[in-house]
């Protein structure tokens, strides 16, 4: 990859990873528009690591508080709102781990194509609109509870289907279950940490076994750009949804789905 490709792909990853608009739908566009080849396993690890650093640093205070409370709940039996939230995040992670392990080969072989991504981009965009408009949206993140956390976790597992959007699916489920927009977004962001960390470790293990040459300059640049873009994305996304809701992202998803359909059928 040349420097221009690194910048564009890292920006796409950083800007779309935490927005409810599907990063996979965007990463397929350069291939469709410009004929770019797959960026490779090492670059995937780099840009995902940049996004992971962004969410960890942005929510560092919440994560540190949750971690300490979680440790206290294990070794001292002290339960608090933050320890419960930590356990709910862990519980919500399990469905994606389970179904990801079972279905990853099937998904990669049969579902990772432009047709599936176009359909899921539109369908789950409409579901996000419905959830945002019709749900009660009055619960805080500390009122999630284990049942709601598990259901949101199943939504995250559903997002293994390309084009669905992990953040889009989890926010849609959280809104349907009564969480406020801010709570739905924060729970989704916090859920991304164990999932992204686990994915980075698994892909990193595959990379360690690979004998392909590694362009370290491209990896460092991609990681930095992805980090900056993802950090800014989280910050401004929380501001946008507090003022305008999910409608701008629904409209964007529908437009993106139409563009993808145009490439497929015309």
UniProtKB/Swiss-Prot annotation:
Any GO BP annotation: response to antibiotic
Membrane topology: Multi-pass membrane protein
One GO CC term on file: plasma membrane
TM spans (from-to): 1-21, 39-59, 87-107, 114-134, 149-169, 183-203, 218-238, 246-266
Gene Ontology terms, MF aspect: undecaprenyl-diphosphatase activity
Catalysed reactions, semicolon-separated: di-trans,octa-cis-undecaprenyl diphosphate + H2O = di-trans,octa-cis-undecaprenyl phosphate + phosphate + H(+)
Major location (coarse): membrane
Keywords in alphabetical order: Antibiotic resistance, Cell inner membrane, Cell membrane, Cell shape, Cell wall biogenesis/degradation, Hydrolase, Membrane, Peptidoglycan synthesis, Transmembrane, Transmembrane helix
UniProt keyword annotation of Metal-binding present: no
Pfam family, one: BacA
Keyword Ion transport: no
Additional remarks: Bacitracin is thought to be involved in the inhibition of peptidoglycan synthesis by sequestering undecaprenyl diphosphate, thereby reducing the pool of lipid carrier available.
Record function comment: Catalyzes the dephosphorylation of undecaprenyl diphosphate (UPP). Confers resistance to bacitracin.
Protein's name according to its UniProt entry: Undecaprenyl-diphosphatase
Species of the source: Shewanella baltica (strain OS155 / ATCC BAA-1091)
